[in-house]
Amino acid sequence: MAGSPDQEGFFNLLTHVQGDRMEEQRCSLQAGPGQNPESQGGPAPEMDNLMDMLVNTQGRRMDDQRVTVNSLPGFQPIGPKDGMQKRPGTLSPQPLLTPQDPAALSFRRNSSPQPQTQAP
């Protein structure tokens, strides 16, 4: 849909004015005296150590909050006697579960009473 020449002129003027406003708001960043952007390396080693400590602490907190589930509806434990196996490199166990027979699950889902229809 093409606009009238007046509309085109208005939008061209608007674009020009808005573009000038954007240019006026731009600023250039310059390194201060004695600061060479190329000489600045990555994060300080102290910051790396802090971040590593934070990641490890949060990971341990998440492991502490994990719940061991002995049985879930529709699943049966397999594997070791208690149904648990330690994951390598962690302190928390990982449950080993296998789904039950799908027919048994569908039977349980459909076991609610069904409305009975009466024959005429």
UniProtKB/Swiss-Prot annotation:
- Quick check: keyword Cytoplasm in the entry? no
Q: Where are the transmembrane segments?
A: none
- Where is the region Disordered? 16-120
> Which residues are recorded with the post-translational modification Phosphoserine?
111
Keyword list, A-Z: Phosphoprotein, Repeat
Q: Where is the composition biased (Polar residues)?
A: 108-120
Q: In which tissues is it expressed?
A: Cerebellum (Purkinje cells) and retinal bipolar neurons.
Q: Which InterPro entries match?
A: GoLoco_motif, Pcp2, TPR-like_helical_dom_sf
Q: Name one GO molecular function term.
A: guanyl-nucleotide exchange factor activity
Q: Where is the GoLoco domain?
A: 7-29, 47-69
Q: Which SMART domains match?
A: GoLoco (SM00390)
Q: Which GO terms describe its biological process?
A: G protein-coupled opsin signaling pathway
Out of the domains of life, which is the source?
Answer: Eukaryota
Role: May function as a cell-type specific modulator for G protein-mediated cell signaling.
Protein name per the record = Purkinje cell protein 2
Origin organism of this chain?
Answer: Mus musculus (Mouse)
